[in-house]
From Swiss-Prot:
The lineage of its organism: Eukaryota, Fungi, Dikarya, Ascomycota, Saccharomycotina. This is ATP-dependent RNA helicase DBP4. Residues 77-251 form the Helicase ATP-binding domain. One of its GO terms (biological process) is rRNA processing. Residues 1-25, 488-525, 572-614, 649-752 are annotated as: Disordered. It comes from Debaryomyces hansenii (strain ATCC 36239 / CBS 767 / BCRC 21394 / JCM 1990 / NBRC 0083 / IGC 2968) (Yeast).
Length: 766
């Protein structure tokens, strides 16, 4: 017993000393933070090791190869460590992710958050890819801390997340899924929340997450630290900051230090090109940059699919990838990882990639379609030249888009250089695209959908000084896609389509989910047969509504009895003038006898008179078949004798022509009849020759019995009358005389047994 008590005392003393050491370390750390003056100490800080942060965080930053601080990190991290709200603005690729992750981890360390305290930090990003990237950086720099972190995004199992979300200290996710967990997950408690981070806040609002963000803010306690970061500052972002931040410190790179919103190491070019030559130029560009890492932006997912499928079939000699919003989560993650790890590759993508994602070492950012505004341009080209690295961008502008877009960019202090395209380097792929569309119906369908989606994307744009849909050559663009003609397009509400395009598709799915968070699939539409429609059919007679009112239930009449007194002496309808469409049709029969008479065809025809046949001339004017002329009209045509002679000559000519045709017809009929007769005679001769060849001679020797069956087999079944017998050899005197004269005896072939005996006796005599 004594040893156990001594061991317990030792353990308690060790725990006490450990706690005292931690408290002492935290106290010193807090002193450093309180003593920090952003105005004085900002220039002296250049490394992460100079910051007043914990040893665990500093070790994680060192192992992740993060050493130097960027401008936004120098200004933001010390203020955030003091616990103040921050509204940060900086250009893309400036290191905003570490600017809010380090203060988040340090805040949890100073508040002594453990795994039993529940949710303490919430980080919200607009896209799944950006959330995954933030989570990966968080794991790298915070692996030496004892916090639990989780990632919740759309496209994953909600039940699996609900079972574990209550045990997380740091939660990274998209607005839609976080809002769903706050509404449905029982164990998700936010009363102990310390830090809220909104990354790419302007993009969250543009994608239609305003309601979800408002819902999230309603669940969070007011005593929290809020960090809001964005590359641009819009009115909606300022409104959000006013609602969620308390006395925020606005941090950003000043205009004196930054001439434009794009990185200084980025070389920016643009070319002026017709719409129908964009794919040819893109193909030529890829073929001439096979040893580069290229990111190509399109305005719609349909264009991404068409370009990917056609270029993949033509095999440019570089790895091709595609990424757009309708991809499944696993496929999107796989594509993101492949492009990040690839040294030379080309990624076709939509604006889903334009925000926050950090792809290492991108050489070229190519914008096939004009961005909707200057902010979108900044985010697109910001994928290259990140963290001071070199990079280039190329934007293709139509002649109708050049002046307006360059004016918008100049207003934001963004200058682009014009690039000429050498015709010898440009290769056309229009014949190959036409061949692919002709051979593969799937590619043809993708081309049609790409055509329609491009025109719709131009139609929904608000800046009509840049996007002029009336000046787009639709027929030439359709032929450049390999299509035989321009498909028909129906345009509907532009503003509604714009909101639907930017809104997250996961929100629509979440609105249809049940209490368990599972998305309820829509019921398949059943095939309705004619019998189903027959049983669903109601009374179609003209008295149906009136009949239902007359045969209403007693309960209905009882309920309406109380209202009858209120309607007493009430004006139902004021006197007014009747319109023509309100007058009744008196021609409709009102009695059964009249209706029966109207259905009788004979009775209906009797009162209508005789029918008149009409003929129509070339102008569509109706004339009677026989029209009588007046005497005056007849005299206007000339003398009667002249008219008579003209009529006779005309009719004579018609008769002569008809006579020639009749003679030719008669001649053809005679020749045809003669040909058939000759053919019939020829067939008869062939049949007779075949019968003669089939005749066989049978000689029976010995025995008195005659084989009648064998004789019948060789007899003709068609012979009704037997042929006359030929004269015998001994009855023919001419043969005898001839034999005597020539010395040669000729005998007929014996046909019967008697002939054979006679022949034998004759031979014996000779």
């Amino acid at each position: 017993m004594g040893k156990k008590q001594n061991n317990r005392k030792v353990v308690k003393s060790q725990r006490k000393s450990h706690r005292e050491k931690e408290e002492e370390t935290l106290a010193k750390l807090q002193e450093r933070i309180d003593a920090y003056d952003p105005v004085v100490d900002e220039k002296s800080i250049s490394q992460f090791s100079d910051l007043p942060i914990s040893e665990e965080t500093a070790r994680g930053l060192k192992e992740a190869s993060f050493a130097s601080l960027t401008d936004i990190q120098k200004k933001t991290i010390p203020i955030s460590l003091k616990g103040e709200d921050v509204m940060g603005t900086a250009k893309t690729g400036s290191g905003k992710t570490l600017a809010f992750l380090i203060p988040t981890i340090e805040s949890l360390i100073r508040n002594k958050i453990t795994e039993y305290d529940g949710l303490a930090a919430l980080i919200i990003s607009p896209t799944r890819e950006l959330a995954v990237q933030i989570f990966e950086v968080l794991v790298k720099i915070g692996k030496h801390n004892n916090f639990s972190a989780g990632l919740v995004t759309g496209g994953k199992d909600v039940k699996y997340e609900k079972e574990r979300v209550s045990k997380m200290n740091i939660l990274v996710g998209t607005p839609g899924r976080i809002s769903q967990h706050l509404n449905e997950s029982v164990g998700m408690e936010t009363s102990n929340l310390q830090v809220l981070v909104l990354d790419e806040a302007d993009r969250c609002l543009d994608m239609g997450f305003k309601k979800q963000i408002d819902n999230i803010l309603g669940h969070l306690p007011p005593t929290r630290q809020t960090l809001l970061f964005s590359a641009t500052q819009s009115d909606s972002v300022k409104d959000l900051a006013r609602l969620s931040l308390a006395n925020p410190k606005r941090v950003g790179i000043s205009s004196d230090q930054e001439l434009s919103a794009t990185p200084e190491s980025l070389e920016q070019y643009y070319i002026k090109i017709p719409l129908d030559e964009k794919l040819d130029v893109l193909w030529s560009f890829i073929k001439s940059h096979l040893k580069s890492k290229i990111l190509v932006f399109f305005s719609s997912s349909k264009q991404v699919q068409y370009a990917y499928e056609t270029f993949r079939t033509l095999q440019p000699g570089i790895s091709l990838l595609k990424l757009y919003g309708r991809h499944k989560q696993t496929s999107r993650m796989e594509t993101t990882m492949k492009f990040s790890q690839a040294q030379h590759a080309c990624l076709f993508a939509t604006d889903i990639v334009a925000r926050g994602l950090d792809f290492p070492a991108i050489d070229w950012v190519v914008q096939i379609d004009c961005p909707e505004d200057a902010a979108t341009y900044v985010h697109r080209v910001g994928r290259a030249a990140r963290f001071g690295r070199a990079g280039k961008s190329l934007m293709m502008l139509l002649p109708s888009e050049e002046n307006g877009m360059l004016k918008r960019l100049n207003n934001n202090k963004i200058e682009l250089k014009f690039m000429n395209i050498k015709q010898k380097n440009k290769k056309t792929i229009r014949p190959q695209l036409q061949s692919l569309c002709f051979q593969d119906p799937m590619i043809k369908n993708l081309g049609q959908r790409a055509f329609i989606s491009y025109f719709r994307s131009v139609y929904v744009q608000k800046d009509k000084d840049i996007f002029k849909i009336d000046e787009l050559p639709s027929d030439k663009f359709a032929r450049s896609l390999g299509l035989p003609g321009a498909p028909k397009i129906k345009f509907k509400g532009g503003s509604d389509n714009k909101e639907k395009k930017n809104m997250s598709r996961q929100l629509a799915a979440l609105s249809k989910s049940n209490n368990e968070g599972d998305v309820v699939p829509e019921e398949d539409k059943k095939v309705r047969t004619k019998y189903d429609r027959m049983f669903e059919r109601k009374n179609q007679t003209i008295l149906s509504d009136h009949y239902l009112n007359l045969t209403g239930s007693k309960a209905d009449t009882a309920e309406k009895s109380d209202d009858d007194d209120e309607d007493f002496m009430a004006v139902k309808r004021q006197d007014h003038e009747l319109r023509d469409d309100e007058l009744p049709d008196l021609s409709i029969p009102v009695s059964k006898r009249s209706a029966k008479k109207a259905l009788s065809k004979k009775a209906s025809v009797a009162g209508k008179g005789n029918a008149n046949k009409l003929k129509f001339d070339d102008d569509g004017v109706a004339h009677a078949i026989y029209e009588l002329e007046d005497e005056e009209d007849f005299k206007k045509q000339g003398d009667a004798r002249v008219q008579k002679d003209t009529f006779l000559n005309k009719e004579t000519e018609l008769m002569n022509n008809a006579d020639i045709e009749d003679k030719l017809t008669a001649k053809e009929k005679r020749q045809e009849k003669k040909r058939k007769r000759k053919e019939m005679e020829k067939n008869m001769r062939q049949e007779s020759d075949d019968e003669d060849e089939n005749i066989q001679t049978v000689v029976s020797i010995g025995g008195d019995d005659i084989d009648l069956d064998r004789d019948l087999e060789h007899s003709s079944a068609d012979e009704d009358v037997p042929e006359p017998k030929k004269p015998k050899w001994f009855d023919n005197d001419k043969n005898v005389n001839k034999d005597e004269d020539d010395g040669v005896v000729e005998y007929d072939e014996p046909q019967t047994l008697e002939d054979l005996e006679a022949l034998t006796s004759k031979l014996l005599e000779h």
